Swiss-Prot record:
The keyword RNA-binding applies. The gene is rqcP. It comes from Helicobacter pylori (strain J99 / ATCC 700824) (Campylobacter pylori J99). The lineage of its organism: Bacteria, Pseudomonadati, Campylobacterota, Epsilonproteobacteria, Campylobacterales. Keywords: Protein biosynthesis, RNA-binding, rRNA-binding, tRNA-binding. Pfam families: S4. This is RQC P-site tRNA stabilizing factor. GO terms for biological process: translation. Residues 1-64 form the S4 RNA-binding domain.
Length: 84
């Protein structure tokens, strides 16, 4: 699944266009490198979202098969990465 579609599906961003724009300006990183919107994600990858307020990191637990994941089920697909 494309990273822009994944971000929208699990609810990290509201719209896919916003996810695409974030990737294009370098606000989305995948496994430590800047990700283009078409980059494919897989289980175990680490996504870093660079916001003005700071950086949020998530580990991908599984790839959703639904178009949009219900908010109550988000924890099945992503987990916040703990600070070491």
């Amino acid at each position: 699944m494309r990273i822009d579609k994944f971000l929208q599906s699990v609810g990290l961003v509201k719209r896919r266009v916003l996810a695409t724009d974030m990737c294009n300006v370098g606000a989305v990183w995948l496994n430590g490198s800047c990700a283009k919107p078409s980059k494919e994600v897989k289980t175990g990858d680490v996504i870093s979202l660079h916001y003005l307020k700071g950086i949020e990191e998530y580990t991908i637990l599984q790839i959703p098969t639904l178009k949009n994941v219900p908010r109550k089920d988000t924890h099945l697909y992503i987990a916040p990465k703990t600070k070491e």
